Amino acid sequence: MLPRILHPEELQGYRFSGKDHCRLAILREGDGASSTVFLEVHDPCDRVPPHSHHHAAEFFFVLRGEVIFHIDDQAICARGGDFLAVPEDARHDLENPGPERLYLLTVLSTDEGFAESLRRGIPTPLDAEDLAVLRSL
């Protein structure tokens, strides 16, 4: 694979459904067995439903904002600059409790069809606020 720079303006956001308050943009797509890297943008008060990844650990780097992760029976608060690793099979969710958007850099150690599933969702461009935040990092 040749190196490639992605500029914020080139990113395509997606929502899984029209009810979602989260946009995800794929930065590097795995082939099912390799990792996928993506940007998550969560609106205030958004909450991702509980789920698990049976063959993938998930890694989160908080770029901006505050987040509460719920992993098994534990609540963990994190903010910009913090990193969290969720082991495979761990039931987890996350919520944005803050009044501002939450930005996460996320890695799934094994794609498990995630990127393909996301691409079947609703294309939703990143807006001017998102692009300004990404440019300021």
Predicted regions and their residues:
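Short acidic-glycine-tyrosine-enriched beta hairpin
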Residues: 73-88
